[in-house]
Amino acid sequence: MAKYKRVVLKLSGEALAGEQGYGIDPEVIQSIASQIKEIVELDVEVAVVVGGGNIWRGMAGSAKGMDRATADYMGMLATVMNSLALQDSLENLDVQSRVQTSIEMRQVAEPYIRRRAIRHLEKKRVVIFAAGTGNPYFSTDTTAALRAAEIEAEVILMAKNKVDGVYNAEPSVDVNAKKYTSISYLDVLKEGLAVMDSTASSLCMDNNIPLIVFSIMEEGNIKKAVLGEEIGTVVRGSN
């Protein structure tokens, strides 16, 4: 039986690119859709927030002289492309889903309306939140934290493609990097650990929303996280 009834799954854009590193890998997105279907079948209400880093990064554009707000809006549009691709993969598996965007584009998706999103979840539809918060200067991690608070999700599942949890140093650089099984948001902020940005961490901490950081690369990990099995790192309001 699932430990959580309502979850927000945070997917990085890079996770959708697979080994090619750019764009959308159809096999990878199909695998993720299959894993989402597994937890929907456990009667879990699933909302998804997708990043856009596989197509465009606002910070990268800004660093090269582009207006930051313009670069961020481009990033939001990239998340819409990813969200539509994920919706298509879910529908191919007969999983009902809805894309809701923070920036209105009614021809392709619903506008974000909190009560409607909750109603979709109650009807066991997967709701994919796209276009970030709709505001520049906010990351999709912050979107995940904000939407989790709004829909009263019990946990955020942060699926990573390069690490399998939270470490005290970059494991790809430091062979002695130590993985935490659990850590508090306060310690994450104090130590400047690269889990999510400080705005997102603070929002989760203030609203007491736990976070499970794990690897998306191993199939079945989303289900393990939902079942409450020991996986990755759990970040809580207090340890």
From Swiss-Prot:
Gene3D superfamilies: Acetylglutamate kinase-like. It holds the Pfam family AA_kinase. Allosterically activated by GTP. Inhibited by UTP. The keyword Ubl conjugation does not apply. SUPFAM superfamilies: Carbamate kinase-like. It is an enzyme of class 2 (transferase). UMP binds at residues 52, 72, 133-140. Catalyzes the reversible phosphorylation of UMP to UDP. This is Uridylate kinase. It comes from Halalkalibacterium halodurans (strain ATCC BAA-125 / DSM 18197 / FERM 7344 / JCM 9153 / C-125) (Bacillus halodurans).
